[in-house]
Amino acid sequence: MTEVHVIVPEGIDDPARPSGGNTYDRRVCRGLAALGWAVHEQVVPGAWPRAGEAGHAALARAVRRIPDGAVVLLDGLIASTAPEALVPQARRLRQVVLVHMPLGHRPPDDEAGAVRARERDVLAAATAVVTTSAWTRRRLGELYALPADRVNVAEPGVDTAGLAPGTTAGDALLCVGAVTPAKGHDVLLAALTTVADLSWRCACVGSLDRAPAFADRVRRRAWKDELRDRVGFSGPRTGPELDRAYAAADLLVLASHAETYGMVVTEALARGLPVLATDVGGVTEALGCGKDGTRPGARCCASRR
């Protein structure tokens, strides 16, 4: 039986903090097990990628316990920050790093050099790298000159779903994602302000505790006159609750500054929901193209001039 040791962050199954990366990791583990692999999962404590000494020590212990020659699949949130634990073990283990978002893509200016150096060392020592989009593979090449043949793309799948009935008025907007600077909720509210004369309401579904100061600012902005009572923040939703949120929507809106893929995009499309999203990262791969090779609705930005 083929074996794989999978190292994932603490909280991977926490319903209060859902994420596309956690969902992807969990589905990979289940998929490998369904194919007959023996999956040995190791959850590492800490607030990765900013885990403290205890988290890094736990990772080092976990890696040292893995037998020689084993395949080790590591979530990039962990791996990309831990060259001290991983690089010395690279000759002994077949390390495969799953990069959801390169930490070196948009790090804080005062940390950029150190963040990129650590990620570069880990990826250079890895046996292979897996990304969730072709955009991410290209970005790793730009950042670290990784040969394309060492970086494998495994796009997320999407479950089939019934068509979302939506609303009679057709004015229900839905934004799914943690309220963080990267997801651009401030940009979304600014855009909604420009169409305040139209009929719409927007439900924002996602964790509010990832960047609490930012989330508080966004929510205060949503309470101002032109947006009051039109934008709601419900916190995270998973399973049937998230299904109901999709079913009640007429349009998915996504204002992210960076996305390696955008699993919520394919979740919406699977339900027949149209999507209006920023043209960043791998979002265009998630959206796909029409038969003529163009993205449906690409000219919608010109519709209100």
What are these model-derived regions, one by one?
Residues 59-86, 96:
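Short N-terminal targeting/anchoring amphipathic segment
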Residues 109-131:
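Membrane-proximal helix-turn-helix segments that form the acceptor-binding/catalytic region
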Residues 135, 157:
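Carbohydrate-associated surface elements
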Residues 166-183, 189-194, 203:
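Conserved donor-binding/catalytic core segment of Leloir-type glycosyltransferases
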Residues 201-219, 235-236:
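Glycosyltransferase donor-sugar binding loop
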Residues 236-237, 244-249:
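Short alpha-helical donor nucleotide-sugar binding micro-motif in glycosyltransferases
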Residues 257:
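Aromatic "clamp/platform" in nucleotide-sugar-dependent glycosyltransferases that forms part
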Residues 274-277, 284:
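Short hydrophobic beta-strand element within catalytic cores of glycosyltransferases
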